[in-house]
Amino acid sequence: MNIIKANVAAPDARVAITIARFNQFINDSLLDGAVDALTRIGQVKDDNITVVWVPGAYELPLATEALAKSGKYDAVVALGTVIRGGTAHFEYVAGGASNGLASVAQDSGVPVAFGVLTTESIEQAIERAGTKAGNKGAEAALTALEMINVLKAIKA
């Protein structure tokens, strides 16, 4: 039996981060966590990280697709926060972002890590952006690095 596993060290990786401006006070913490994980744990060089800001979570898939198709990046980390309100808007935005990002990864073959918080409240979002529940931006960054290495191992 062959087993493929990978670690998160990827010092030569080129990683793009797409990040939503809407709910920026939360997303800034996700970005800090992602960059810290990439550089400190993954050993990615700061010059090999590109950050692209978009208006909101719904716009993440299009920017992520452009980055994935550019051939310049080994992975893309998508960061944002969608907080449920009193209308169906949450479902449209969260579902559109989630489905769109999954499609980008499948269509491009470039790992896309999902670091979009979908929460019931601002408090839940804050907890997941570096307080009680860890930092989901950091987790997404590490997922991207691991997937870079998994795909390399599969192709080897």
From Swiss-Prot:
CDD domains: Lumazine_synthase-I. The active site is at H89 (proton donor). (2S)-2-hydroxy-3-oxobutyl phosphate binds at G86, T87, R128. Catalyzes the formation of 6,7-dimethyl-8-ribityllumazine by condensation of 5-amino-6-(D-ribitylamino)uracil with 3,4-dihydroxy-2-butanone 4-phosphate. This is the penultimate step in the biosynthesis of riboflavin. Transmembrane segments: none annotated. It holds the Pfam family DMRL_synthase. It comes from Salmonella typhimurium (strain LT2 / SGSC1412 / ATCC 700720). The lineage of its organism: Bacteria, Pseudomonadati, Pseudomonadota, Gammaproteobacteria, Enterobacterales. Keywords: Riboflavin biosynthesis, Transferase. One of its GO terms (molecular function) is 6,7-dimethyl-8-ribityllumazine synthase activity. Forms an icosahedral capsid composed of 60 subunits, arranged as a dodecamer of pentamers. Its EC number is 2.5.1.78. It catalyses: (2S)-2-hydroxy-3-oxobutyl phosphate + 5-amino-6-(D-ribitylamino)uracil = 6,7-dimethyl-8-(1-D-ribityl)lumazine + phosphate + 2 H2O + H(+). This is 6,7-dimethyl-8-ribityllumazine synthase. GO terms for cellular component: cytoplasm; cytosol; riboflavin synthase complex. Pathway: Cofactor biosynthesis; riboflavin biosynthesis; riboflavin from 2-hydroxy-3-oxobutyl phosphate and 5-amino-6-(D-ribitylamino)uracil: step 1/2.
